[in-house]
Amino acid sequence: MIDERFKSQTAHNLPGDELSIAKTDRRVETVNSNVPADERLKFVEGGAEFLERIEPLWKQQTALHAEKSAHFAESFTTANFSDRKRVFEQKARAGSLLVILAIVGPDEIAGYTVCSVCEELSDLGTRKVGEIDSMFILASYRRLGIGRKFLLRCTQWFEQNHAEKVITLVAVGNEEVLEFYRLAGLLPRAILLERKDQTD
């Protein structure tokens, strides 16, 4: 169940904000329209065509996971964006993919999130599973509500795409984000154990 605090805090913007949604092939939401254009924050939505733009931030996220990982730091330091991009593209082909960029000024990406809806085969049959695949916000832009806006939009998108189950993976060492995801009703369910090979 979604925390009511999450609904009330994310359904509105910061005081004085005004929103506008451009009627184009992708959704554009502008926040803080009362400030100069070069300082304005906007949210832009697209699909796999946006993946190249998230690479620098994805690498920062991976480096952060490497710092925090107690057992599998090497798997993060050797991670390759091209491989991850292929996974995202496969999800786009097999189901649906949403990429949201938080952009400051003309073209500075302050954060991004990638989510998907794909079919999953289980003992109960086939069902649609929504997943928050990746989310990262630059440190200088945290505590501004960007993550909450990402989370709200992902939740809406999952509902629009009839996801019957919603998941996200949290790396060990990054447990501080559990409370954030709890706001959207995402709760810890299992702990995955993986054998550490000698090469890791």
Language model features: what each stretch is:
Residues 101, 108-117:
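Conserved beta-strand in the GNAT
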Residues 148, 172-190:
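Conserved active-site alpha-helix within GNAT-family acetyltransferase domains
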Residues 1-13, 17-52:
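Conserved N-terminal entry element of GNAT/NAT acetyltransferase domains
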Residues 119-132, 142, 189:
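A conserved beta-turn-beta hairpin within the catalytic core of GNAT-like acetyltransferases
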Residues 159-169:
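Conserved GNAT acetyl-CoA-binding A-motif
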